[in-house]
């Protein structure tokens, strides 16, 4: 199955999900679905670095938040155009701003991608657990910067009023459906990319870094370049997942954007699903994401983090290769009884 | 900006007191991460657990939090030994400690924190003791007992640990396991047993550090997250596993943080430790007194 076929199938599945949603006709489905799709993107992005290269990133929340805050900054910029620019330039900028969300997603991806590139250079000196701790540090430094950056609201947070509807090609679409569709497309792109990486020379290069970086370097694998690609891609996807978030949530504050919940989820989902292939993060995030939505509605949002924690610990102990690993083992046993 | 002298001196003194407390917080990680190479990022969560135990006993029976924490030491030791046993069987034995071990402790951090939230809620809790409130005045210097007592207890604990590690047989065995596990095995000692003891001790320090924490500031379950960075920053800056280095690094960080919050505002303080950590990792990963 080549990449084109795969993305066609992925889009097909996406359309089925859409049809199902339309048939349900529940706004809540879009809200919940958006969160799950967002986790698919985050988990897949984390897995590009964590699963393929073996570098644990505890700072997912920082990349996510950077995407979200780049949107907030652009939104605020839109509000300040008249005060910052002379009258002859302002109308020109008003024609461009406010930027449509796909552009914001792209922008968030670029910002977080650059940050990811920076993180990639950290891998020059830091391996293993040191790298993991450094990413955690990176997240807190960035959070402190945002808390002290008044333009985007500082610690008070920023409000973004979500429009009720949006008009695309003459059709009036509910805004939440619009966000949902965008995230669906993003999830398809992320999964297609991850799958393409896995089957390419790049993926094999990543695997050599994961298994033995020194040996890989000795055999002529350009480890630094590969690591930089991985961190940039991973960071960019996380930023893209975060960019529409302020419009989804309506009110963004540093504590929620930089919440460790994103970090633990984007680690737990691939770990529970399985880190060696693109299916793992997908399975993990759909399962864990739905479970959390159910737990949030029926019990409380604190409990859903407890569930994530317990599942994460259980899975890393009992099933180191996740659900995908478990099923593969099962099939192997059946074939050779 | 005119910096007044007494403000500066007080900020430095407050920083030193804070640094002494940070040393107690870091002692456990210095053992587990520095000597045993176990990246226990859940350590701050155990510290918060210690705070809550001190809190419950203090509120119900009015017993001093520091005494409570000393009584709770064996329980924390046992907890640590148990965690290490699980960690060893599931990760070290299989040689998977790097990626999955990290995820394991990360999960443990969340389980502890969320369990505390479910039981106690997210309200700030505090303890009551005679030395919370009054302060000593020495000329220009103001020393609140609330900070001084934890600092002294922390230094005492730190000194005892240092004596234990350098003077006793078991302590030297722990140093040995951190240097060469195979050689220790050749001496007919069981490295796993020694590591279990050492990890037990490292978690036991969390009991005392927790009590000190809740004396210094009101505690709610997610406060621990702030300490993840501090603890590792101090540990790395001090040179992994070096106890004197850890103490110096803790004092430096305490002073720098105190100066930052005095002169730039408390909202910048968290960035100090992590900034320190990033800089150290990038430029001198061996730390101040590293090998």
Tell what function each PLM region has.
Chain B
Residues 18, 142-219, 243-249:
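Helix-loop-helix "hairpin" substructures at the membrane interface of multi-pass membrane proteins
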Residues 24-28, 45-49, 207-208, 221-240, ...:
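Hydrophobic alpha-helical segments embedded in the membrane of multi-pass proteins
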């Amino acid at each position: 199955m080549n990449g084109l076929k795969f993305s066609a199938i992925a889009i097909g599945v996406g359309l089925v999900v859409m049809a199902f949603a339309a048939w349900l006709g529940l706004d809540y489905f879009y809200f919940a679905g958006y969160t799950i799709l967002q986790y698919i993107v985050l988990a897949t992005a984390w897995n590009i670095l964590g699963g393929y290269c073996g570098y644990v990133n505890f700072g997912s929340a920082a990349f996510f938040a950077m995407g979200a805050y780049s949107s907030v900054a652009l939104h605020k910029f839109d509000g300040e155009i008249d005060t910052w620019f002379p009258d002859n330039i302002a109308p020109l900028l008003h024609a461009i701003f406010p930027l449509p969300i796909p552009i914001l997603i792209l922008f968030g991806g670029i910002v977080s991608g650059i940050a990811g590139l920076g993180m990639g250079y950290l891998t020059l000196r830091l391996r293993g657990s040191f790298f993991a701790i450094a990413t955690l540090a990176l997240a807190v430094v960035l959070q402190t910067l945002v808390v002290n950056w008044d333009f985007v609201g500082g610690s008070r947070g920023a409000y973004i009023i979500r429009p009720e509807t949006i008009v695309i090609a003459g059709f009036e679409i509910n805004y939440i459906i619009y966000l949902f569709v965008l995230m669906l497309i993003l999830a398809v792109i992320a999964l297609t990319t991850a799958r393409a990486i896995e089957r390419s020379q790049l993926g094999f290069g990543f695997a050599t870094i994961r298994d033995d970086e020194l040996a890989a370097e000795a055999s002529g694998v350009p480890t630094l370049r590969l690591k930089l690609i991985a961190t940039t891609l991973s960071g960019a996807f996380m930023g893209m997942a975060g960019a529409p978030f302020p419009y989804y949530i309506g009110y963004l504050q540093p504590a929620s954007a930089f919440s460790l919940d994103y970090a633990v989820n984007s680690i737990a989902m691939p770990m529970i699903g399985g880190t060696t292939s693109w299916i793992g993060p997908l399975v993990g995030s759909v399962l864990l994401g739905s479970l959390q939505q159910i737990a949030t509605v029926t019990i409380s949002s604190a409990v859903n983090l407890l569930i994530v924690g317990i599942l994460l610990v259980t899975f890393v102990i009992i099933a180191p290769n996740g659900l995908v690993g478990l099923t593969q083992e099962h099939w192997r046993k059946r074939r050779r009884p | 900006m005119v910096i007044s002298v007494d403000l500066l001196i007080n900020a430095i003194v407050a920083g030193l007191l804070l640094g002494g407390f940070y040393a107690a917080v870091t002692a456990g990680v210095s053992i587990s991460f520095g000597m045993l190479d176990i990246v226990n990022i859940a350590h701050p969560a155990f510290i918060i657990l210690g705070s809550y135990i001190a809190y419950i006993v203090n509120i119900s029976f009015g017993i001093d939090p520091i005494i409570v924490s000393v009584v709770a030491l064996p329980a924390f030791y046992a907890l640590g030994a148990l965690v290490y046993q699980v960690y060893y069987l599931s990760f070290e034995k299989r040689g998977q400690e790097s990626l999955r071990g990290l995820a394991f402790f990360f999960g443990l951090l969340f389980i502890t924190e969320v369990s505390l939230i479910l039981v106690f809620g997210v309200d700030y809790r505090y303890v009551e003791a005679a030395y919370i409130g009054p302060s000593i005045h020495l000329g220009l210097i103001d020393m609140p007992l609330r900070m001084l007592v934890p600092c002294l207890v922390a230094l005492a604990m730190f000194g005892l640990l240092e004596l234990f590690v350098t003077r006793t047989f078991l302590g030297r065995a722990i140093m040995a396991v951190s240097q060469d596990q195979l050689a220790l095995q050749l001496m007919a000692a069981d490295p796993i047993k020694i590591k279990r003891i050492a990890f037990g001790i490292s978690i036991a320090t969390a009991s005392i550090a927790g009590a000190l924490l809740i004396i210094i500031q009101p505690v709610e379950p997610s406060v621990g997250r702030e300490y993840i960075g501090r603890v590792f920053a101090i540990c790395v800056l001090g040179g992994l596993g070096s106890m004197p280095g850890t103490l110096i690094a803790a004092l430096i960080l305490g002073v720098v943080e105190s100066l930052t919050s005095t002169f730039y505002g408390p909202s910048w303080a968290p960035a100090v430790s992590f900034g320190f950590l990033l800089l150290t990792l990038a430029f001198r990963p061996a730390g101040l007194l590293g090998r």
